[in-house]
Curated annotation (Swiss-Prot):
Family membership noted in the UniProt record: Belongs to the methyltransferase superfamily. RNA methyltransferase RsmG family.
Record-linked PANTHER family: S-ADENOSYL-L-METHIONINE-DEPENDENT METHYLTRANSFERASES SUPERFAMILY PROTEIN
Entries under NCBIfam families matching the protein: rsmG_gidB (TIGR00138)
Organism, as annotated: Shewanella sp. (strain MR-7)
One GO MF term: rRNA (guanine-N7-)-methyltransferase activity
InterPro entries: rRNA_ssu_MeTfrase_G, SAM-dependent_MTases_sf
Protein name: Ribosomal RNA small subunit methyltransferase G
Binding site for S-adenosyl-L-methionine: G74, L79, V125, E126, R140
Extent of the signal sequence: none
Entry EC no(s): 2.1.1.170
Gene name of the encoded protein: rsmG
GO cellular component assignments: cytosol
Highest classification ranks of the organism: Bacteria, Pseudomonadati, Pseudomonadota, Gammaproteobacteria, Alteromonadales
């Protein structure tokens, strides 16, 4: 059932996937559902809802990624980082979260599913000082845009971008973007079977 739904959703957003990638995405949902019962990793309890609200909600960003080296800040159980890593094996993803149980889950997922292009790091974002800066800084349900930019300002490389995944955009939040940052693109995203607003904001440092 889930397999057929995933197939249909991927076709709907026109995202090609190999049989192995589809299996990894479904196995990730299975592991998230299993671990969630003990570790409370997400408020979404149903695998079908996870497929829409977590997997597809992450994957609609995939065509918009530019660069090779990304960080997913406040990633939680690995969202959007793990689905994006599965679909972009040529890119690398650092998954950053301050809670150990989430990092343990991510590492187990990477091990069991054979995902080799992610590394999970337990740290608060403002304390994390990477040796190599990032082409893209991803944030989904992590913080307000103002806080994301304030806390993550040190993470992008010279021509790196921030990718803020938001629901409904409020004028108030947009007006609070700190000085020195510019929104270069606002993209309306359509997630299959999700009747809610989704937006991707691309932001650069001036």
């Amino acid at each position: 059932m889930l397999s057929a739904q995933l197939e249909a959703y991927l076709a709907e957003i026109n995202l090609p996937a190999t049989a192995e990638q589809k299996k990894q995405l479904l196995d990730f949902v299975g592991m998230l559902n299993k671990w969630n019962k003990a570790y409370n990793l997400t408020s979404v309890r149903d695998p079908e809802a996870m497929l829409v609200r977590h997997i597809m909600d992450s994957l609609v960003v995939s065509p918009h990624l530019q660069g090779e080296h990304f960080i997913d800040v406040g990633t939680g159980p690995g969202l959007p980082g793990i689905p994006l890593a599965i679909m972009n094996p040529d890119k690398t993803f650092v998954l950053l979260d301050s809670l150990g149980k989430r990092i343990r889950f991510q590492k187990q997922v990477a091990f069991e599913l054979g995902i080799h292009n992610i590394s999970s790091i337990e740290s608060r974002v403002e304390a994390y000082q990477p040796e190599q800066k990032f082409d893209g800084v991803l944030s989904r349900a992590f913080a307000s845009i103002h806080d994301m930019l304030t806390w993550c300002h040190h993470l992008p490389a010279e021509h790196g971008q921030f990718y803020a995944l938001k629901g409904q955009l409020s004028d108030e939040e947009m007006q609070q973007i700190p000085a020195g940052f510019v929104v270069t693109e606002t993209i309306e995203l359509k997630v299959p079977r999700l009747d809610e607003q989704r937006h991707l904001l691309k932001i650069i440092k001036e």
